[in-house]
Amino acid sequence: MGHKINPKGLRLGYTQDWQSRWFAPKNMPALIIEDKRIRELIEERFKMAAISFVGIERAGAFLRINIHTARPGVVIGKKGADIEQLRKDLEKMTGSKTFVNVVEIKNPETDASLVAQSICMQIEKRAHYGAAMKKAIEKALAGKALGIKIMVSGRLGGAEIARTEWKREGRVPLHTLCAEIDYGTAEAMTISGKIGCKVWIFKKTHFAKSPKEILHELRKHREVTETPSGSAETVTEAK
């Protein structure tokens, strides 16, 4: 099961926290769709900002967006113009009072989503997929990751028949629930068609702790990195 399911979904509430943190007794389907539209808008507008994920919190008529990115300057824009325009557009879309925070990812080489995006960008620039995977693995291990696995699939190198290839270094214990596994995917658009990339990164193991204690630590860490201040606020995330 651990090799088939999304490792983040398998560990939700244990070593992984939710990206959408809210509860609504009514209109939940509509709000879930709204979350999807918010993420699509942000990812489409800031394609070159190296966005890992977008956290969403709701409280009554208030909406808080936390954008986790390796390039906060691209999101904020000159004198905060871009992020302010984004806030206005989100308020118009949702009808809620919106606050937007930018959280800087300090170590992008150990963030699975950013690693997958980087590999796909290199493939789109016609770099060899094997060299891109090898370079990503070296950077991740240098960034103190305990293990990494990368898989690419599609018409690799313009081949007539699609295939899947993967590389792994170190340990990636997908069945161990107390292991903190980061997982990310991305797609590269080439002249031969789409090439998909999946990345698993093993960061650390939580020993001798209950699920409640681990989840409390995760939320405490997010409270430090996600400050509920002004719309152009930037903080640093230590990963």
Curated annotation (Swiss-Prot):
The keyword Ubl conjugation is assigned to this record: no
GO molecular function: mRNA binding; rRNA binding; structural constituent of ribosome
Role description: Binds the lower part of the 30S subunit head. Binds mRNA in the 70S ribosome, positioning it for translation.
Organism: Elusimicrobium minutum (strain Pei191)
Keywords: Ribonucleoprotein, Ribosomal protein, RNA-binding, rRNA-binding
Protein name (record): Small ribosomal subunit protein uS3
Assigned GO CC terms: cytosolic small ribosomal subunit
Swiss-Prot/TrEMBL GO biological process terms: translation
SMART domains, alphabetized: KH
Subunit field text: Part of the 30S ribosomal subunit. Forms a tight complex with proteins S10 and S14.
Keyword Ribonucleoprotein: yes
Family: Belongs to the universal ribosomal protein uS3 family.
KH type-2 domain ranges (all copies): 38-106
One family name in Pfam for this protein: Ribosomal_S3_C
Organism domain of life: Bacteria
InterPro entries, A to Z: KH_dom, KH_dom-like_a/b, KH_dom_type_2, KH_sf_prok-type, Ribosomal_S3_C_sf, Ribosomal_uS3_bac-typ, Ribosomal_uS3_C, Ribosomal_uS3_CS
